[in-house]
């Protein structure tokens, strides 16, 4: 191409101070002294692209232009413009020239038909970039008429100490925005938006306050631009392939980094069919990477190709799971998971409750003695007979004057099993005459010297005659073994009171492996500090304990109605006569671990013999004469334990059975978790047995 023709076309636009509004400033001024070098740089493509190809071969895809010194220009003109690096150190006033440049933008936009980008580097002083971006290509399947309606407006909007924004706007629904940098000034952004709506083409140069360019006279430069379309398009394609479809730009002034994520098929719209096909294939291969670089208005095809790859595991919704598993399997699995969570929540609650109760009881067993006096005052009327009460909270004190509905069948025993657990203590209470005292064993007025007399005692019953009360105290006799002797007790209502279970007071520290049955009111000097009647059975006196009876009230320590019966008083059987029947009383048992002070553990029976009725005994018996005038019931508690496990045997005339209990209260609070695990396992096993026994 001819240099003279190009010089004539380029000469006028390159006067930087020439502007249409310079009339008030004294007219045009002298051009810069090195304008001829600029003309040569703009006119010779080989020189321009040779230097630029070297710069683009860098690994970081960036290039920095030479910063001219103000001494090389008459008025201190300083420019720093590049495609990849733009230094806007003196461009505060450049935003005022957008309106005056609209006519030139329309001319360039209407004539530009291809995606191209022209970069110029001036080795000495200047760097004048020219951005030309055409309409979208036909690679997206748009018709030629549709392409004519598309408008792309790449803009370079400089501002002082800010980045430059390169934005491609498509008014009819452009699918791509390429952002080189951001304009931080509001007025710059507003002007950029206005230019984008108008579909114009903006070229803004960084100039000093005293230097302006008359862009209206530079329309003739468009002919020169058309001459370089082919070479620019080829260079742009090569550069985009080298950069992987992306160009990074760094603004060193602001420290901000922006990305130029472009696609070949969108940058080179009207190339040959081969180019379009190549661009389409390349864009699809780079779709996933480009999705992370472009903004939210990226093209639909890129977004569709990359949507599946960009989904992370955190974004999976229940609908996705349903689609994979199927609706039936999903609901079946969901139901199973919900049931397991529900069961686990109940089990966890029970386990935590056991641990908490054990720690409370183990930490302060002696403090619970202060509340014994109110235990005997609990009214049995406050506990409904036919209601299954939680064994963790209540112990119904059987009273002779309370009329209890007779139980004629054993179905309530099964009904009680549902609530049964190893947390509760099982005991049987029955009345007996005070004349049977000689058949019972240890624990007299004064604590015996031997460690054996450590067992359970119950509150007194009113004596058979007179207005005073009488206690039957177990005493270890050297000739007879464990016997009971009468002892006058203080006035008392005679209630078998006591709360057994979670968060309830234990009156005394009881022997290990044996459940507590009942406690007398405090203040009796004939009881040892932590004295209880031993639950370990003495074989010597086991033959002296049997009594034929039909108890009026039979209930466990937790007041379940399945253990209550109305019976009539009967005479004592012979010493060697075994109990005819045993009835199993499946109850919730809340055992407590205690330090054993019994010396007769070795004599305790084990196995079935230890739990038979013939081996059972009554810890004590107290008779209320006033309440027995009209065939008042007698109550007997028969318990036995084995050396291998703690067992409570309940002996009645109408049935028999055995309920095993496990110790709960540890010696110290550190063992609470270990014991709770064992109790929890026992609860689960008991529930399994109950479920298997269901019809």
From Swiss-Prot:
Chief location of this protein within or outside the cell: nucleus
Induction context: Expressed with a circadian rhythm showing a peak 14 to 16 hours after sunrise regardless of day length. Induced in roots after infection by nematodes. Up-regulated by auxin and cytokinin and down-regulated by abscisic acid and temperature stress.
A GO cellular component entry from the record: nucleus
Residue ranges with Basic and acidic residues bias: 1-11, 216-226, 234-253, 260-283
Entry's Gene Ontology molecular function annotations: DNA-binding transcription factor activity
One GO BP annotation of this record: response to abscisic acid
Positions of the UniProt region annotated as Interaction with ELF3: 261-484
Source superkingdom: Eukaryota
Alphabetized UniProt keyword annotations: Biological rhythms, Nucleus, Phytochrome signaling pathway, Transcription, Transcription regulation
Biased composition (Polar residues): 54-74, 551-567, 579-588
Low complexity: compositionally biased ranges: 598-616, 636-653
Subcellular location: Nucleus
Positions of region (Disordered): 1-33, 48-75, 136-159, 216-283, 541-653
Subunit structure: Interacts specifically with both Pr and Pfr forms of phytochrome B. Interacts with ELF4. May form a homodimer.
Stated role: May be a transcription factor part of a circadian clock input pathway. Acts within a 'zeitnehmer' feedback loop and is involved in its own circadian regulation. Has no role in regulating circadian clock function in the dark. Part of a corepressor complex consisting of ELF4, ELF3, and LUX involved in the transcriptional regulation of APRR9. The activity of the protein may be decreased in long day conditions due to its interaction with phytochrome B (phyB). Can regulate the initiation of flowering independently of phyB.
Protein's UniProt name: Protein EARLY FLOWERING 3
Annotated source species: Arabidopsis thaliana
